[in-house]
From Swiss-Prot:
Taxonomy of the source species: Bacteria, Pseudomonadati, Pseudomonadota, Gammaproteobacteria, Pasteurellales
Name the record gives this protein: DNA-directed RNA polymerase subunit beta
Family as reported in the entry's similarity comment: Belongs to the RNA polymerase beta chain family.
Organism (species): Histophilus somni (strain 2336)
Purpose: DNA-dependent RNA polymerase catalyzes the transcription of DNA into RNA using the four ribonucleoside triphosphates as substrates.
GO biological processes: DNA-templated transcription
NCBIfam families cross-referenced by the UniProt entry: PRK00405.1, rpoB
Top EC category: transferase
GO molecular function: DNA binding; DNA-directed RNA polymerase activity; ribonucleoside binding
Family annotation (InterPro entries): DNA-dir_RNA_pol_bsu_external_1 (IPR019462), DNA-dir_RNA_pol_su2 (IPR015712), DNA-dir_RNAP_su2_dom (IPR007120), DNA-dir_RNAP_su2_hyb_sf (IPR037033), RNA_pol_bsu_bac (IPR010243), RNA_pol_bsu_CS (IPR007121), RNA_pol_bsu_protrusion (IPR007644), RNA_pol_Rpb2_2 (IPR007642)
Length: 1342
């Protein structure tokens, strides 16, 4: 494998035995692709905005004289970039302009000649844009729109599994679900009649729908039944015989023909009998007259002389009726063929309970059901039924729905109309009856072939369409008002409903969520999440076990591990690593194609529907060098996802990778295969809660997924083009681009500005640190700067800690952990949290609020940290209660006492008509002010601080642009210099000239002269571009801010809080092994080994066996080996040993085991080997991919190479006594995470605070500064102790006895410590409640 310069800095040794066939795809594809399809820079009419416009336009007026046509749309460029939108609290969006054409026709002309055409561009609101990382910035906060897993449109056949009726009879039903429009259900009742429901309303006999479709009784019977014809001949009754239909029946009479008895009466008819009948070509057989009694006529029989119907279709035939028919001259009688086994008389029975008799009566019945209480007219009834399923405006199956519909009914063609046809409805009823007759099976709703993904783009399109429909109504009204001479398209369209619909979706839809920004992994996972909840989905309460369960079709599509614990379990899932959606929105996963037992290079993506037909081998099946299966029988998933053994030649496909089953978070757990699934679930979920530490530390034991996650999350800075680092500091990196990657005529310089100390959604700190040095070569796509929780471009959520599994004085009882003080001293788990506090000055009725340092009744000390504008200065250390922004609010005038009047007259007005409403630091918070931002409304005068900030921003912007210009100019002049030197000038001549004069020289060579002129033009362009950019920046900085109505000024203060680890903080490993820190122990008391090296954390060994997450033990052993090798390398470097020896040792470590990725150090230079060695000193990073990890013998060999005991256990000594512990202890390195459940955020104690209005009891919860509930069990405890007075105090003065509270306060102030309890308010509440029931209740106080 060839490594680039940066990759050679640190190479992770992989134990994976299977070669990587397919690279991990870009992890945010699902979001970006979906939104691209919605926006469509080059539109096609099938989807996105274009489709929405085309489905609504043209809008035609009611009289048909004018129409508004759609031509095209154009998206503008956003005014502010993403960063600016976040700071200003605005939405990152682009304006949508649509070209419309208003065409009016001549009324009189029958042909409808065009009278007038007006074309115009119309503004249609703002469309939020997706950032390059798959998020949206809405009102300044980053949000993610989660994809939804919903039931695919189409037709579904299901049964109630015998739960509806007491007899346990299975009732079948069919449901046609469109993409939008009314649902149509067909269902059997316990009496086997077929009913239909529209939109889950009252049921009607299903035949009403058929009659409404203009079918007669005869035609209906024709559609659903085979016929049996009887012939009356010489007073005998002959039946036409179809032998196959007799199978399984019992003969009710002797079946004979030509004097031969084929089947005796009472015998069961078998295949042998049928063969004999077919062999002798028997087509008619005589039957007794009684046989026809009870059969049902298949058509109307009319008396030809009178025209009277003797026997209507669907009537049971009796002997009298037979006589009548015979007399009327009918020789042939057709009846319906039914039997009890597999041809039920369902439709015939249903027709009998059907109240309708023709099309109109059926339409009226449907109208009455849909619109009860309204008088039906023919037109209304017809219009309603037509609009239900046959109008493309009201009903749409969509391409997916049509495809699923046709496939379900076995129709080859998967395309067709979006509305239903007569045939569609009849076919659905036919298939439902077939299923009831025992042919065919019901669908599995939880199969991923029946559930599809609806992503951002599609949901945004639907919302946009809803907005357009609202506009359409308004436009239609406007068009029918007449007076269209002066009207332009702009006058007709109001953009408000459109932008409101879109805004509502992005701002408050259940699926548009506040992005989880704890760390890069949580961002990536959030964007790859799939929810079954949300509009048009399930609800938590209604979802049963089946929906939440893991399904066979989840394999390689949805992760079986990662899902929340709690009420949402199984409803919110995560996409598997390699999964993607196809054009229809179904999830697909890749497989390697197998031909005749040999695996090919070809990779195919299969959806759940297609996969069911094939036999698929697992990724860890054994292959030889020619990619043939070596085993005689291979474990595979066969049809319907059942596992079994198959011969190699029967196999069609093979998995791509061992980690294709799991999601990104689960693929980051090493030795996942050794963990119980429940614990793995916790491990996957807890990695997302890890807080980025001060210094990121790559995991020693990883899985190889760390790099793709860090790269795709977008938190790190990635090189757009290859080149050389020309300049680097903490806030910017400049790259001189390689010649072959530059576009002709550009300066070839890329500048990357880094994000410094900004706040994330979860109040963690986002900071980028360069990881390249001056002069280093870099390639396109390589990491230039690490973001939060990334280390040299690898995900690093926690720290590698030296752990020991042993009890220690009960300090690790029940999952608690003992942590060494050294961990705190070295700041291993110190995290920075940034809080944003804002102060808003509003315009009130009594006057406007003012931000000032002149605050009434506040001492000097409290104002010491404010500047003259009343705003805290940057760098101030503040604690709870300190003033950050001074603000006063006008008070209403009150009646003044004479004394006050006198004071007013002497000391002037101002003092008392304002009250202090300053922004203070919340209790329990302390930190350093790192940034202040002031936003001022247009037209309001800016204060001194705002002007200072503005000036600073201008300076910074100018400095950035000037530096950028200098770098670009330097690059340009370097090329000019080379050109001039090659064109006959020498260094001395050039030194005497000013740089700008170089461009004015003339060269003999015409080609070079042209190049020089081009460069001169570029120089001018650069200058102009610089001026233009500076002007734009300046106008952006100076312009007033767009604030909410009534707001004059907003001041935002950012506090940075540094949190060290302390008892009560929650920590966890990656295997679901979580715990709370019980004690920070002095380093000298920690257990230590023979070399005097103490452990960092002591974990309880009892936490392992019952939880069955053995992965943590293997990780600990492997971590020890990795560290051991690092120590050996470190010793060699310290002893200044020969580079070749060092190279040999490192090569030996990389070669150990039978991993498929080999590292060849012979191609490295000595300098590269040394740099690699220096980076390996703290431990050699290892990768053990999921389900393809390190084996026990490899771990032992690695331990041996590191000079460590192969048992992984070490003799430890007690730090307090120096005595040896009685047996060796498992010691090693485990990757530990600090989770975002910090004791500082949870610790809370109430003093005097707010009370609930009705009950007058203290509120609950930290946010409300509430108390702890003294519930009934606590009351029992005090009762049991007999502590009557304590109990009385708890239930009265400490809770809701209002008078008692005030008396208590008086007593305490007065120095008498006694208590006078009164009546608790909750007692009054219950009295009032009883009175509200009409019962008079009084308290007799004796």
């Amino acid at each position: 494998m060839v490594y680039s310069y940066t990759e050679k800095k640190r190479i992770r040794k992989s134990f994976g035995k299977r070669p990587q066939v397919l690279n991990v795809p870009y992890l945010l594809t699902i979001q970006l692709d979906s939104f691209d399809k919605f926006i469509q820079r080059d539109p096609d009419g099938q989807q996105g905005l274009e489709a929405a416009f085309r489905s609504i336009f043209p809008i035609v007026s009611n009289n048909g004289n004018t129409e508004l046509q759609y031509v095209s749309y154009q998206l503008g460029e956003p005014v502010f970039d993403v960063r600016e939108c976040q700071i200003r609290g605005t939405t990152y969006a682009a304006s949508l302009r649509v070209k419309l054409r208003l065409v009016s026709y001549d009324k009189d002309a029958a042909s409808g000649t065009i009278k007038d055409i007006k074309e115009q561009e119309v503004y249609m609101g703002e469309i939020p844009l997706m950032t390059s990382n798959g998020t949206f910035v809405i009102n300044g906060t980053e949000r993610v729109v989660v994809s939804q897993l919903h039931r695919s449109p189409g037709v579904f056949f299901d049964s109630d599994k015998g739960k509806t009726h007491s007899s346990g009879k299975v009732l079948y039903n069919a449901r046609i679900i469109p993409y939008r429009g009314s649902w149509l259900d067909f269902e059997f009742d316990p009496k086997d009649n077929l009913y239909a429901r529209i939109d889950r309303r009252r049921k009607l006999p299903a035949t009403i729908i058929l009659r409404a479709l203009n079918y007669t009784t005869e035609e209906i019977l024709d559609l659903f039944f085979d016929k049996v014809s009887f012939e009356i001949k010489d007073n005998k009754l002959l039946m036409t015989l179809v032998p196959e239909r007799l199978r399984g029946e019992t003969a009710s009479f002797d079946i004979e023909a030509n004097g031969k008895v084929y089947i005796e009466r009472g015998r069961r008819i078998t295949a042998r009998h049928i063969k004999a009948l077919e062999k002798d070509k028997i087509t008619q057989v005589e039957v007794p007259t009684e046989y026809i009694v009870g059969k049902v006529s298949a058509k109307d029989y009319v008396d030809l002389t009178t025209g009277e119907i003797i026997c209507p279709a669907n009537m049971e035939i009796s002997l009298e009726l037979l006589e009548k028919l015979s007399q009327a001259g009918y020789k042939n009688i057709e009846t319906l063929f039914t039997n009890d086994l597999d041809f039920g008389p369902y439709i015939s029975e249903t027709l009998r309970v059907d109240p309708s008799y023709d099309r109109l009566s059926a339409l009226v019945e449907i109208y009455r059901m849909m619109r009860p209480g309204e008088p039906p007219t023919k037109e209304a009834a017809e219009g309603l039924f037509d609009n239900l399923f046959f109008s493309s405006e009201r009903y749409d199956l969509s391409a997916v729905g049509r495809m699923k519909f046709n496939r379900s009914l076995g129709i080859e063609d998967t395309t067709g109309s979006g509305t239903l046809s007569k045939e569609d409805i009849v076919n659905v009823m036919r298939k439902l009856i077939d299923i009831r007759n025992g042919r065919g099976e019901v669908d599995d709703i939880d199969h991923l072939g029946n559930r599809r993904i609806r992503s951002v783009g599609e949901m945004a399109e639907n919302q946009f369409r809803i907005g357009l429909v609202r506009v359409e109504r308004a436009v239609k009204e406007r068009l029918s008002l007449g007076d269209l001479e002066s009207v332009t398209p702009q006058d007709l369209i109001n953009a408000k409903p459109i932008s409101a619909a879109v805004k509502e979706f992005f701002g408050s839809s259940q699926l548009s969520q506040f992005m989880d920004q704890n760390n890069p992994l949580s961002e990536v996972t959030h964007k790859r999440r799939i929810s079954a909840l949300g509009p048009g989905g399930l609800t938590r309460e209604r979802a049963g076990f089946e929906v939440r369960d893991v399904h066979a079709t989840h394999y390689g599509r949805v992760c079986p591990i990662e899902t929340p614990e709690g009420p949402n379990i199984g409803l919110i899932n995560s996409l598997s690593v390699y999964a993607r959606t196809n054009d229809y929105g179904f999830l697909e996963t890749p497989y390697r194609k197998v031909v005749n037992g040999q695996v090919t290079e070809e990779i195919e993506y299969l959806s759940a529907i297609e996969e069911g037909k094939y036999v698929i081998a697992q990724a860890n099946s054994n292959l030889d060098n020619e990619l043939r299966f070596t085993d005689a029988f291979v474990t595979c998933r066969g049809e319907h996802g059942e596992s079994g053994l198959y011969r190699p030649e029967e196999i069609h496909y093979m998995d791509v990778s061992t980690q294709q089953v799991v999601s990104v978070a689960a693929a980051l757990i090493p030795f996942l295969e050794h963990d119980d699934a429940n614990r793995a679930l916790m491990g996957a979920n807890m990695q997302r809660q890890a807080v980025p530490t001060l210094r990121a530390d790559k995991p020693l034991v990883g899985t190889g997924m760390e790099k793709p996650v860090a790269l795709d999350s977008g938190v790190a800075v990635v090189a757009k083009r290859g080149g050389t680092i020309q300049y680097v500091d903490a806030s910017r990196i400049v790259v001189k681009v390689n010649e072959d990657e530059t576009i002709a005529g550009e300066a070839g310089i890329d500048i990357y500005n880094l994000i410094k100390y900004t706040r994330s959604n979860q109040n963690t700190c986002i900071n980028q640190i360069p990881c390249v040095q001056l002069g280093e070569p870099i390639e396109r796509g390589e990491i230039l700067a690490d973001g939060p929780s990334t280390d040299l471009g690898e995900l690093a959520l926690g720290q590698n800690m030296r752990v020991a599994f042993m009890p220690w004085n009960g300090y690790n009882f029940e999952d608690s952990m003992l942590v060494s003080e050294r961990v705190v001293q070295e700041d291993r788990f110190t995290t920075i949290h940034i809080q944003e506090l804002s102060c808003v000055a509003r315009d009130t009725k009594l006057g406007s609020e003012e931000i000032t340092a002149d605050i009434p009744n506040v001492g000097e000390a409290a104002l010491s940290k404010l500047d003259e504008s009343g705003i805290v200065y940057i760098g101030a250390e503040v604690k709870g209660g300190d003033i950050l922004v001074g603000k006063v609010t006008p008070k209403g005038e009150t009646q003044l006492t004479p004394e006050e009047k006198l004071l007013r007259a002497i000391f002037g007005e101002k003092a008392s008509d304002v009250k202090d409403s300053s922004l203070r630091v919340p209790n329990g918070t302390s930190g350093t002010v790192i940034d202040v931002q002031v936003f001022t409304r247009d037209g309001v005068e800016k204060d001194k601080r705002a002007l200072e900030i503005e000036e600073m921003q201008l300076k910074q912007a100018k400095k950035d642009l000037v530096e950028e210009l200098e770098i670009l100019e330097a690059g340009l002049f370097a090329r000019v210099r080379n050109l001039l030197l090659s064109g006959g000038f020498n260094d001395k001549q050039l030194e005497n000239l000013d740089r700008t004069q170089w461009l004015e020289q003339t060269l003999v060579d015409e080609d070079k002269q042209n190049q020089l002129e081009q460069l001169a033009e570029q120089y001018e362009e650069l200058r102009k571009d610089f001026e233009h950019k500076l002007e734009i920046k300046r106008s952006k900085i100076i312009q007033g801010d767009d604030l909410a109505p009534g707001v004059l000024k907003v001041v935002k203060v950012y506090l940075a809080v540094k949190r060290q680890i302390q008892p009560g903080d929650k920590m966890a490993g990656r295997h679901g092994n979580k715990g709370v820190i019980s004690k920070i122990n002095p380093v000298e008391d920690m257990p230590y080994d023979e070399n005097g090296q103490p452990v960092d954390i002591v974990l309880n060994p009892l936490g392992v066996p019952s939880r069955m997450n053995i992965g943590q033990i293997l990780e600990t052993h492997l971590g020890l080996a990795a560290k051991g090798i690092g120590d050996q390398i470190n010793a060699m470097i310290k002893q200044k040993q020969d580079v070749e020896k060092l190279r040999g040792y490192i090569q030996k470590a990389y070669d150990l085991g039978d991993g498929s990725q080999k590292v060849d150090l012979s191609t490295f230079t000595d300098e590269e080997v040394l740099r690699l060695a220096k980076n390996l000193r703290k431990g050699m990073p290892l990768a053990t991919p999921v389900f393809d990890g390190a084996h026990e013998k490899e771990i032992k060999a690695l331990l041996e190479l590191g000079g460590l005991p192969t048992s992984g256990q070490i003799i430890l000594f007690d730090g307090r006594t120096g005595e040896k512990f009685e047996r060796p202890v498992t010691v090693g390195y485990m990757y530990m995470l600090k989770l975002n459940h910090l004791v500082d955020d949870k610790m809370h104690a109430r003093s005097t605070g707010s009370y609930s209005l009705v009950t007058q009891q203290p509120l609950g919860g930290k946010a409300q500064f509430g108390g702890q509930r003294f519930g009934e069990m606590e009351v029992w405890a005090l009762e049991a102790y007999g502590a009557a007075y304590t109990l009385q105090e708890m239930l009265t003065v400490k809770s809701d006895d209002v008078n008692g509270r005030t008396k208590m306060y008086k007593n305490i102030v007065g120095g008498t410590h006694q208590m006078d309890p009164g009546t608790p308010e909750s007692f009054n509440v219950i009295m009032k409640e009883i009175r509200s029931l009409g019962i008079n209740i009084d308290l007799d106080e004796e």
